[in-house]
């Protein structure tokens, strides 16, 4: 039977069977010796001496301490960033590179302790990391335009630009209505029927928008029918019609439009031309040739710079329910994007904040990956001079007081990416990190 089981042959070969028995016995003995050796090593191996470490954590309690010397003592800290600041305050070398060593709690039971360091805790902060310089602030709505939530995204996924003719209509705080097109927001005069007709806004219900989104969108001029001084008076010499009329001249395959003013002509966008025609005496465009334009005086009286240049198409909430302000270093003022879903990388999952209020004005979720250090920037601010922030993986922003504090935390300042301060200030904020706090002791750690 043994031969059949071992060799697959019912005919026994006694010497071969004995060899196999010896090999099995030797393997068993070696295995037992290995187990015994491991047990002996576990008993005899000395536990790490906390005095020789920089930061220690109790194996059972999870309590963390920075190790101070002269004399040897333990300084209770909230987490590793706080420990690094304490080590820097103690002028310990390589504080920014310090990591925690796990030691048995019983080895710490008789160790001298100080009061806790006056450094706040910071959950899920990784000072060595940074966040890719691509940010977005997004509002999401339901098919009827009702607000669903607001999300701040760091390391936003690239998305194709929206069509220049596409626009969204927003209902902002304070009963304001905004037309967002061409990367900017324009306030709409709800009582100006001509504006609503020219931009085909009649009957369209604006989608709800938070102050967080509206505040970061670049603002263009308000959309209201321009007031033309002396409308209806005779046009200046050499110009047809009356003040307030609109002239049209063919240029290549397109047309240019000119408002007749008391001082001469002003070129205007098509939308402004349409508004002026509605309000003019002639009620129609007056075609002119190059000879009239060549002899005319041109002025810049009407405040129409920055108006939409061409026809627009308002995108409905059920088509593209997400509206975002987007930012990257090449566009310091930011831009506008809208689509069917948030601009997230595949697999990314936003963290829902405790302050989330859904249809309210607060930020509801944040997606910044593992978080990290960033340098705040904004329009008009030179690169690399803004304040440092630490953004946690759960979406909380912490200020960093100065360069020595950043170095103590382990921030690699040369690798830190810029981030828009406008977006950072929308995040829930924690108490700033400051190396000066690490030298003070308190009975209760500040929150």
What annotation goes with each model-predicted range?
Residues 1-447:
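Short, surface-exposed polybasic-aromatic patches that bind anionic ligands, especially phosphate groups
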